[in-house]
Curated annotation (Swiss-Prot):
It comes from Arabidopsis thaliana (Mouse-ear cress). It comes from the Eukaryota. Keywords: Leucine-rich repeat, Repeat. The keyword tRNA processing does not apply. The keyword DNA-binding does not apply. It holds the Pfam family LRR_At5g56370. This is Putative F-box/LRR-repeat protein At5g15620. LRR repeats lie at residues 4-31, 126-153, 156-181, 194-205, 210-235, 264-289, 318-343. SMART domains: FBD (SM00579), FBOX (SM00256). Transmembrane segments: none annotated. InterPro entries: F-box-like_dom_sf (IPR036047), F-box_dom (IPR001810), FBD (IPR006566), FBL60-like (IPR055294), LRR_dom_sf (IPR032675), LRR_FXL15/At3g58940/PEG3-like (IPR055411).
Length: 440
């Protein structure tokens, strides 16, 4: 028997006012009366002020049974006279069981988000951008359902404790945090990512315009994220990493570039040692910028731990970029299975007249004799004689190799056939090694 249908309409409205849009959707299938009384908007998106203003006028007149599942507001600009209209709308939407809230408003620093944004019980995904300044969170800040938080060009200040730290603390089930167009040095307060539940973290710096005076406010970054499995980190290295807890890390993608102000970086006492040690449990490691290898694994080689769990390593390379840091990484990775070279194979670029010459950093490739990798992938291979000769050295040293996968840049059929023949004729130490060639 459908007991809900026998309830008075005002009681049904009252019940629905406590439900998220998802829960209200479920109840619509339980009770026929609910189907008639409950309205659920799945997707509400606005990019223009006029259409938004008309919506707000109608929204404020809707009963509590009008629920919204996803609300997205994107405004190129907003002046002071529009603040109250936007805030009235947001407060109303937040009471309608919204699950997905996206605010992309180009605001001035004097705009303050309504406190209801930080006390919503239903929101599961929250995106804030671009240009919000979050200074103070309400004392009762709590987002009990929030699992994904995306911040785009958002700055945090610290009038009453660090607003960023408080926001993370108010999100007890947070699983994913994305901070885009990041500029730590413009924040006021700690750069401390702390969450016991966080599983995925993406930090992407907007740009690097070094202003020495800002570095006094950018002394350190810390990670206390014991459940974190995925880290995508594009930034410059601060003075240090006092706390690094990445015990559950599975995959890390690092982009820590050496920019035009590298001399300034060297003059600072920056020390990424704790970050390097904190990655010791990583299983998949990707290094996307060439000089990240030098900055982390060569300049601070003493801090490099043994990567017992590392099975897949991907590094960016160039033909004339020495493999000193790669050698250190390989020697510290006793269980590595797959090595991907994002770029060309390194060889003695400056000794083209001596095809058998081996760059000093390779030491005759002897360090490969104890390398356990089974799969070697090279994404850029032209097939000139220097590359072929150095490939011979590599294949002659890797005892466990089972697959060489090469992506060749060639268009002419005769060139493709020649490269294929050259690669297949190379002697291999491993009798199990097969060669797979992709042409582009």
């Amino acid at each position: 028997m459908d007991r809900f249908s026998n309830l008075p309409d005002d009681v049904i409205y009252h019940i629905v006012s406590f439900l998220s849009a998802k829960e209200a959707t479920c109840l619509k299938f339980v009770s026929k009366n609910f189907q008639n009384l409950v309205t659920i908007k799945r997707n509400v998106v606005f990019h223009h002020w006029e259409s938004f203003k008309n919506f707000v006028d109608g929204l404020l007149a809707e009963p509590a049974s009008y629920r919204i599942k996803r609300f997205s507001l994107k405004l190129v600009s907003m002046d002071f006279a529009q603040y109250n209209i936007v805030n009235d709308c947001l407060c109303n939407v937040l009471k309608r069981g919204v699950l997905d809230l996206e605010l992309d408003i180009n605001v001035k620093e004097d705009y303050i988000l309504p406190s209801d944004v930080f006390t919503c019980k239903t929101v599961v995904r929250l995106k804030l951008g671009c240009g919000f300044v979050i200074d103070i969170l309400p004392k009762n800040a709590l987002l009990p359902a929030l699992k994904t938080l995306i911040l785009d060009s958002v700055r945090f200040y610290a009038s009453d404790g660090c607003a960023f730290t408080r926001l993370l603390s108010a999100s007890p089930v947070l699983e994913e945090l994305v901070i885009d167009r990041l500029n730590w040095e413009h924040w006021k307060g700690s750069r401390f990512v702390s969450s016991p539940t966080l599983k995925r973290l993406t930090l992407r710096r907007k740009e690097w315009e070094p202003e020495p005076e800002t570095w006094t406010d950018f002394e350190s970054v810390s990670f206390d994220t014991p459940s974190l499995a995925y880290l995508k980190y594009k930034d410059v290295i601060p003075y240090g990493y006092p706390i690094v807890n990445l015990n559950s890390i599975v995959e890390a993608r690092l982009t820590l570039p050496r920019e035009v102000e590298y001399d300034y970086w060297l003059n600072r006492s920056a020390d990424p040692s704790n970050l390097i040690r904190g990655l010791k449990n990583v299983e998949i490691l990707s290094i996307k910028v060439l000089h990240t290898m030098d900055l982390l694994f060569y300049n601070f080689k003493e801090a490099v731990p043994v990567f017992e769990n590392l099975i897949h390593l991907s590094v960016t390379s160039e033909a004339d970029f020495c493999w000193d840091p790669l050698q250190i990484l390989l020697e510290k990775s006793p269980n590595l299975k797959t090595l991907t070279i994002e770029g060309p194979l390194h060889y003695n670029f400056y000794e083209k007249l001596d095809l058998e010459a081996v760059c000093e950093c390779l030491l005759g490739y002897s360090f490969l004799l104890s390398c356990p990798i089974k799969v070697l992938k090279i994404t850029e291979f032209v097939g000139d004689i220097g590359e072929i000769v150095q490939m011979k050295h590599v294949l002659g040293k890797l005892p466990c190799l089972e697959l060489l996968e090469v992506h060749v840049q060639a268009r002419r059929d005769d060139k493709k056939l020649q490269i294929m023949a050259d690669l297949l004729m190379l002697p291999r130490t491993s009798s199990k090694c097969k060669v797979k060639v992709h042409f582009s």
